[in-house]
Curated annotation (Swiss-Prot):
Belongs to the SPT6 family. Disulfide bonds: none annotated. It comes from Caenorhabditis briggsae. This is Suppressor of Ty 6 homolog. GO terms for molecular function: DNA binding; histone binding; nucleosome binding. The keyword Metal-binding does not apply. Residues 77-89, 127-149 have a biased composition (Basic and acidic residues). Interacts with glp-1 and lin-12.
Length: 1521
């Protein structure tokens, strides 16, 4: 029985795998323990992960629950490490496989020199001797180790010996020509190999002796492996034969693959799994899905279609994801009448079902692009391409959910069978019924299924191991010998719930009136009445007292816990609490000290760092991921709670919603009922508040985090889609026609790239229509300015002359310039001027446009390994230019080029948070977009085989993938690197029918180029999007459009129609579609119209045309390298110049010069020029714009920001007072802080302010709607206080006192030092309050320190220590006397108390509840009334003794104080703790003096039930990190 069939799996992390999932190599099976011809049954558990969670939960629950028991050790468990797949593979390799490996390992020459010929199995001895001789020769060249490896690999074809010493005696005859013939006698499973598969495999892998047995073992392989034999036939010397059988040597032989790193095998697609994917006739992406595509019947497809409609297109998210989900919404359901919604919805469900039918029905196996292009009628314009991918992705989720449901169903069914048929009485307590199994089938989400499994694990988890043992024994009784290896883990012995079950506490829980399931069913309506017990709760509990539960309070607490636990695991209860929590949860945020220093104006959370009472439903897009990341980095503290501040103030907690409905309360008012109602309320309170709320907090947190991550992935996908959505530059047809014969009809693109390092040379490159490099240009001084000083202008002109000659010689159709920084705009103008000069001189036929282009992709390519491998001699900037030119030609091949084994595509910057999300999900979404665009454009398969930079496009073709594309290219290279027609994909490349159907329509054959290379017939339709399945319809349309006889040549008709496509307009395609429908082809109207469109223009580019970045897009590209500029942020800028407003000549007459007290006249415009008479000022104004004339009125300053952008600061934003001349406030070439007031990206305009009021002011209008102003003000006040305190500390006089205990530190620093010092140490430091005083600090226990003031007097100097030190009315001469007489006595008494065995170390005496719990624990542990010491936090040097003073279990708390003279207790003095305790033990029953005022006690036992707690207010919110 298969391992998976024997065990239902729940955990994703389960190690169990089915043999059906992946073929095992033969060597893998040989490496395992040999199997006898006996059936082996392996029981495993998928509950390991869940059990570990329960185990951890159990440990937490057991802390402080009941009396201690002896700890029981768990059995040591060890897991066998997985064997390396690399060492298990024994594949046949053809020459190209070996070449690929050697290329990766950089040993091409070595392999060629040491090539070994592998001998074939034969009856003749010559191949055997040759193979052995080759091995010996190889060993002599490489050494014995390599020789052994090569013989191990070739042993299948030769004699199979490892060395000469291993040969049998039968091998002594070598040269008589009658060598023994060896036959293997073994079980074979060839019936499982499809007919013709071996032939296909030989063609694909390029080897003649391909053997499936070397890749995959059949089902009987393991059973027959032990008995594998060799049969040796020899001549008996008398004309007869002797057959000798012997066990075949199964010693593991080292192969070539075993010497290769696994990563290299993966990169080369050389593993057994890769080979299987290549051979199997199914789309590669179907096989690579985490949950592979499986077969489904019609009923299953209907259920799945309804499920996808509900959860993919109708289900709402917890947070607001409307913006990122817009692309996936169903456009057909938008803006329609409510009366039509239901019909439209049903139509969409049918369309989804049709799509699933194409995907999951094995006879179809169609990928999304094929469905979108060639099955349009089935989706009837109801689903877009994005919708189709959503259906595909949700199909994977549905299959995953179905598999988990199946496994849990099987597990529960087996448990039910165990309950019914076994003799285990404990298993029958809670029988599994049919409804429990039905609930699994009705589960629609992973959350619901997890709830069911959690409940199952609680109730039956402890029985799993017993169940598997029973199943083993049952199989053994049926005659099946089993090998048993249990992987179930029973519930741990110290699990709190399980201990209650084992001690029979569940019977008391059953007397509470309702079971957990009945309680859950009562949530909607009162389906079950409460069965009231006649006994009082504590009286009922007395019946179940046992050694583990020693009193009735403990018994009752255990029963309450059991029922609460069961309630918390009920799926209906969880579902209700989950929905309440998701609908009403709020969160609070505040920055930590690190966050306040780190989060500045440019941080995404700057205006969201103080949040109060924000509902999680108000979170948008990826907002929560920013919070999560900031929390991980220690920048913020965050709280997630159900109740808002208003709810807490009104006492409206989550549990109260469940208690207010009186679901678990009896409507009677007797004392018995009231006590039981109180117990029931406590149960519900425990289930909701203590168990479900923490669980739901974590679940909701993870849910909204996943939604935020998915938002990032979708935004990355959208950004990526926008980058590949446009085509390359296509020159106008006139430009192509007017060229000479040498350059005609060929697109040529040029790109120039410069480095941000100005000393480096710039490079230009020309590529042809295939992206191949034609020529390149090196310009050393391209980035210099033409009007610079010295010889800069001449050097610039030298580079520009080289550019002109290059353009004149190569005649590019367009020129691209990389956007590196702000300099690109100037360099573009230089290029445009040079091109215009060439055109004006008639050196080129037409104007050549210069385009600025984003160079991010080009820079990624420049740094990639694949770029270095393709262009090893080119400098980095030239490699960047090559990529930029190819992008200008067509961006898609260049993006696909980076989708390689190095994953260079993920170096693109698509979103600031893209590194913080699951890269597998990101890769899946980006892959969808590339698949869409590649198939929309079509793939020229011959170009992929000829040019390496086009090769990667093939893997995105519908039906293919990286492995199948690699195999296909290998076949093409074996066919002279040319595919003349699509049909050759089947005939020559051996594509299976399903893969061919998927990819055929998207593979383009450039019929013009192919016709030039071959004399074979070339099908013109192979160069179109018309699918081969509809070629006959296309020919029929061509013949009908030309109105010729049906016997006419359809190929000629097609050629004529393509030259005159307007003749197709007269065709009645609707009638043609109706005729096809009548003939049984189905609805094909959309297909016919697509064929007509394709005949009019083959493979018309459906992408948007190329455009140069401009406006906001160009602004973002130019500013991406520097600090992000946002409105409200503060930036450093340098004043470059003063901006003047020109003098309007019409206004000169109205301008009146200002007259000063010095009898001078000032120009009213510039406010700078002065003259002795008004006429001179007028002449100054009239000469405006000329040398010496008026420059105009100053209106502001030009500022250069850190990111290279130029901004403007008007006069009104320079200062709060009026400014005529900005230079009176600022200086040129000096840096100042500015605040960004406004940004206009279209005009490249940034408005600044340097007014002090603007720099100090935040931007409250931009803050979050739930901004916590109070917390913000408190933090600002605290920061100011801390700053003031630090200033005061810095100004405090440093004392110079020569004593080992003296330190110039603060109180906080002193406490930290004491934590690292011995218990007997103390620290003397300067007093923070008085100059003539000291402070002494010493440690009592953790977090409690005693600090007191020492007055100094009779000081000689201000800095010296006083000759008299006074504390509490006592005088001391020096510090040593102070420490010896005053400090050390208190430290010693304190140490005696804090190291006592009954000292409470978990808290302080103020923590009364914790102290009392500790007293009870000590009583159970010791069996008598104990006493406990605790220290006071609020009053250092004061301690408390807590003890039970009578049989009523009441606890009394008495305080005592220590001093240098001893201990003061009950108004008496004791010189040691021992003397105090001796007196206390004799008088503890006596009431202490002043009991009413100075003593406190609290009852802990009563005759009635524990105090009623229908709900508990949670503790005040505490920020956690």
């Amino acid at each position: 029985m298969d391992f998976i069939d024997n065990q239902a799996e729940e955990s994703d992390a389960s190690t169990g795998r089915s043999d059906d999932d992946e073929p095992q190599s033969k060597k893998m099976k040989m490496a395992k323990d040999k199997l006898k011809k006996k059936k082996k049954v392996v029981a495993s558990s998928d509950e390991d992960e869940d059990d570990e969670d329960d185990e951890e939960e159990g440990r937490k629950e057991m802390q402080g629950f009941i009396a201690d028991e002896d700890d029981e050790e768990e059995d040591a468990r060890s897991e066998k490490s997985d064997r390396s797949r690399r060492s298990e593979i024994n594949d046949e390799l053809d020459d190209e496989d070996l070449d690929l490996i050697d290329e990766n390992l950089d040993r091409q020459g070595e392999r060629k020199k040491n090539r070994v010929r592998l001998g074939d199995s034969s009856d003749e001895d010559e191949p055997i001797r040759r193979s052995n001789q080759d091995d010996d020769d190889l060993q002599s060249e490489r050494g014995s180790d390599d020789g052994d490896k090569r013989r191990g690999h070739g042993g299948r074809g030769g004699g199979g010996y490892d060395s000469d010493s291993d040969r049998s005696e039968d091998d002594f005859i070598e040269d008589d020509g009658d060598a023994p013939r060896r036959h293997r006698k073994r079980h074979r499973g060839d019936e499982h190999i499809p007919e013709g598969a071996e032939d296909d495999a030989r063609d694909v892998f390029g080897v003649e002796d391909f053997n499936f047995d070397e890749f995959y073992d059949d089902d009987d392989g393991e059973e027959g492996l032990e008995d594998e034999e060799e049969e040796i036939i020899e001549d008996d010397g008398e004309g007869g034969e002797i057959k000798i059988r012997r066990k075949r040597d199964t010693t593991k032989k080292t192969t070539l693959l075993e010497s290769i790193e696994p990563s290299e095998l993966e990169r080369g697609f050389l593993s057994a799994a890769d080979k299987k994917i290549m051979i199997e006739d199914a789309p590669e992406r179907f096989q690579l899905r985490r949950t592979p595509v499986t077969e489904a019947d019609d009923d299953e497809l209907e259920r799945e279609a309804q499920w996808i409609m509900k959860f993919a297109f109708e289900e709402t998210t917890v947070t607001n994801q409307a913006a990122v989900d817009a692309d996936g919404k169903l456009e057909c359901l938008m803006n329609i009448d409510s009366s039509e919604i239901e019909d439209k919805r049903r139509a969409v469900v049918n369309a989804i079902k049709a799509v699933l039918h194409f995907i999951r029905v094995r006879s179809n196996s169609f990928e999304v692009p094929f469905i979108g292009f060639y099955r349009k009628e089935s989706i009837d314009n109801l689903l877009t391409m994005n919708n189709l991918w959503i259906v595909y992705d949700y199909d994977e989720k549905y299959c995953h959910l179905s598999e988990k449901k199946r496994r849990l169903y099987d597990l529960m069914r087996r448990m039910r069978e165990y309950q019914e048929l076994s003799d285990d009485i404990t298993a029958k307590r809670r029988p599994i019924n049919e409804m429990d199994l039905i609930d699994i089938n009705f589960a629609e989400t992973l959350e619901q299924l997890t709830d069911i499994h959690a409940n199952f694990q609680l109730l039956y988890g402890s029985l799993l191991e017993d169940m598997t043992k029973w199943e083993k024994e049952r199989r053994a009784a049926d005659g099946e010998e089993t090998e048993y290896r249990a992987k179930f883990k029973s519930s741990i012995r110290n699990d709190k719930y399980q201990m209650c079950v084992e001690n029979g506490i569940g019977e008391l829980a059953g007397r509470f009136g309702l079971t957990a399931k009945q309680f859950a069913e009562n949530l909607d309506w009162r389906k079950h009445d409460i069965d009231q017990d006649s006994a009082f709760p504590l009286e009922a509990a007395e019946e179940y007292i046992c050694p583990a539960f020693i009193d009735r309070e403990t018994v009752l607490n255990g029963a309450k816990f059991m029922l609460a636990k069961e309630i918390s695991r009920q799926p209906l209860v969880r579902s209700r609490v989950r929905q309440e929590f998701r609908d009403n949860a709020h969160f609070w945020v505040k920055p930590t000290k690190k966050g306040r220093d780190t989060i500045d104006e440019t941080h995404p959370l700057f205006n969201k760092r103080y949040i109060k009472n924000k509902p999680i439903r108000n979170l948008t897009d990826e907002e929560f991921l920013y919070y999560h990341k900031a929390k991980q980095d220690g920048l913020i503290d965050m709280v997630l709670m159900y109740e808002s501040d208003e709810d807490q103030a009104a006492n409206q907690f989550l549990v109260k919603k469940f208690l207010s409905d009186s679901i678990f309360r009896k409507d009677e008012y007797t004392d018995n009922v009231e006590q039981w109602n109180a117990v029931r309320d406590q149960c519900v309170n425990m289930a909701i508040t203590e168990m479900l709320v923490p669980y739901m907090k974590e679940e909701v947190y993870n849910t909204i985090l996943e939604e935020a991550k998915m938002a990032v992935a979708k935004k990355c996908k959208k950004e990526f889609a926008s980058r590949i959505a446009r085509s390359g530059y296509v020159p106008e047809k006139e430009k192509l026609d007017e060229e000479d014969e040498e350059h005609s009809a060929r697109r040529r693109m040029m790109a120039i790239c410069y480095s941000p390092v100005r000393d480096e040379a710039s490079f230009g490159v020309m590529v042809d229509e295939n992206g191949a490099i034609v020529d390149y240009l090196r310009m050393v001084h391209f980035t210099k300015r033409g009007h610079g000083g010295g010889n800069t202008g001449a050097l610039k002109e030298e580079s520009m002359e080289l550019f002109k000659k290059f353009v004149q010689r190569r005649r590019p159709h367009a020129i691209a310039l990389n956007i590196e920084d702000m300099e690109c705009t100037r360099l573009k103008r230089d290029l445009e001027e040079a091109v215009a000069e060439l055109y004006s001189q008639s050196k080129i036929f037409s104007q050549i446009n210069v385009y600025l282009m984003d160079n991010e992709l080009a820079k990624v390519y420049m740094r990639s390994n694949i770029s270095i491998a393709e262009n090893p001699d080119h400098p980095p900037t030239l490699r960047q230019a090559v990529s930029l030119a190819r992008q200008l030609l067509d961006p898609i091949p260049e993006y696909a080029h980076l989708w390689n084994s190095d994953e260079d595509i993920f170096c693109l910057s698509l979103h600031p948070l893209q590194r913080d999300i699951d890269q597998e999900i990101l890769a899946q979404l980006l892959n969808h977009e590339l698949v869409n665009r590649v198939n929309e454009e079509g793939v020229d398969i011959n170009k992929c085989a000829e040019f390496p930079h086009y090769t990667n496009m093939l893997q995105f073709t519908c039906g293919l993938g990286p492995r199948k594309a690699t195999s296909l290219l290998k076949s093409i290279k074996a066919n002279d690197n040319l595919i003349e027609s699509r049909s050759k994909l089947v005939v020559g490349c051996k594509l299976g029918p399903k893969v061919f159907m998927n990819c055929a329509g998207f593979i383009r054959i450039d019929t013009r180029r192919v016709s030039d290379k071959t004399d074979a017939y070339v099908e013109v339709l192979d160069g179109s999007r018309v699918h081969p399945e509809t070629y006959e319809w296309a020919r029929k349309m061509a013949v009908d459009a030309l109105e010729v006889d049906d016997s006419a040549d359809p190929t000629a008709a097609l050629q004529e129609i393509m030259e005159t496509p307007e003749r197709l307009r007269d065709l009645d395609l609707d009638a043609f579609a109706d005729e096809l429908n009548r003939q049984g082809f189905g609805e094909k109207k959309a297909t016919l119209y697509d064929i007509s469109s394709e005949l009019s223009e083959r493979y018309k580019d459906l992408r948007a045309p190329f455009v140069e970045p401009s406006g906001e897009a160009l602004y973002d590209l130019l500013t991406r390298s520097g600090k992000e500029v946002k409105v409200g942020c503060k930036m450093l800028g340098t004043v470059q110049s003063v901006q003047y407003r020109k003098v309007e000549r019409d206004t000169i007459d109205s301008m009146i010069p200002e007259h000063t007290e010095e009898d001078q006249y000032i120009c009213p415009s510039c406010k700078i020029f002065t003259a002795a008479d008004p006429q001179s000022v007028r002449e100054h104004l009239l000469n405006a714009g000329r040398p010496g004339g008026c420059v105009g009125s100053a209106c502001g300053i030009r500022v250069r920001l850190d990111n290279g952008m130029t901004a403007f600061c008007p006069n009104k934003f320079i200062s709060s007072s009026h400014v005529d001349n900005p230079l009176t406030r600022v200086k040129l070439n000096q840096p100042y802080w500015f605040k960004v007031m406004a940004i206009n990206k279209e005009k490249f305009s940034i408005l600044l302010s340097c007014k002090s009021s603007d720099l100090k002011e935040d931007a409250p209008a931009e803050r979050d709607d739930f901004w916590d102003q109070q917390q913000y003000d408190d933090d600002v006040a605290a920061m100011k206080k801390e700053t003031t305190k630090k200033k005061d500390a810095d100004t405090r006089v440093k004392r110079v006192i020569a004593h080992p205990n003296f330190h110039n530190v603060s109180y906080e620093a002193a406490t930290k030092m004491l934590d690292e010092m011995d218990w007997s140490d103390c620290i003397i430091r300067p007093s923070a309050n008085k100059e003539s005083g000291l402070s002494v600090t010493w440690k009592i226990c953790d977090r409690i320190y005693h600090n007191f003031f020492v007055k100094e007097s009779a000081k000689d100097q201000v800095f010296s220590i006083g000759r008299t030190l006074s504390v509490g009315g006592e005088d001391f001469e020096d510090l040593d006397e102070l420490i010896a007489r005053f400090v050390l006595p208190m430290i010693q008494i304190s140490h005696e108390i804090t190291t006592h065995k009954y000292f409470f170390t978990q808290g302080t005496s103020e923590d009364t509840d914790q102290v009392e719990t500790f007293v009870h624990e000590k009583r159970r542990e010791l069996g008598r009334s104990p006493y406990v010491f605790s220290a006071s936090y609020r009053q250092p040097c004061q301690f408390c003794i807590s003890y039970m003073f009578d049989n009523s279990n009441r606890i009394r708390h008495e305080h005592f104080k220590i001093s240098p003279r001893g201990i003061r207790f009950r108004q008496q003095n004791f010189d040691s703790l021992d003397r105090m305790m001796a007196w206390f033990k004799r008088h503890f029953n006596e009431p202490p003096p002043g009991i009413r005022s100075s003593l406190s006690y609290r009852p802990t036992g009563r005759t009635g039930p524990p105090p009623s707690a229908p709900y508990q207010q949670p503790p005040q919110q505490q920020y956690y990190r």
